[in-house]
């Protein structure tokens, strides 16, 4: 499914060129992963949907990353906790995402739920990472989880994303290791999702 060569799409700096590569190389892989992920997600009694990023508002600059989001809502995902599989120029990531679009209406409710799952987050493998913005390629140790919740509560453009990132060149790119790792991450994050949904 995914290959180390997928990162080469980011070498094309033009909007049209990169978008064509995203549509022809990456989006089909997102759809293929969705065919694996959706049956697993649908076992919880909810119907889940895959939302592949279209980048329709882009008119000048090529996107620095692209993604597919999984949510139990056919019309959208940003206003709900959801899962997100994406690719940057140097890594593929899979996150349980609570994005800024839930603010301000749901801030108090979701931050309380995020605090309640802190023990579950601490049980995740040490290799799991935390991001505070799905549009910035920077991650943190899970030890900063509580700080990230406080930041989410007080900073307008902040998010809480928990999951895995697989760096370009990682040995997992050989064989099926990457898909297995992404599916395992989803299964490990599902109990947390169930508590914050």
From Swiss-Prot:
It comes from the Bacteria. Coiled coil: none annotated. HAMAP family: UPF0637. Belongs to the UPF0637 family. It comes from Leuconostoc mesenteroides subsp. mesenteroides (strain ATCC 8293 / DSM 20343 / BCRC 11652 / CCM 1803 / JCM 6124 / NCDO 523 / NBRC 100496 / NCIMB 8023 / NCTC 12954 / NRRL B-1118 / 37Y). This is UPF0637 protein LEUM_0496.
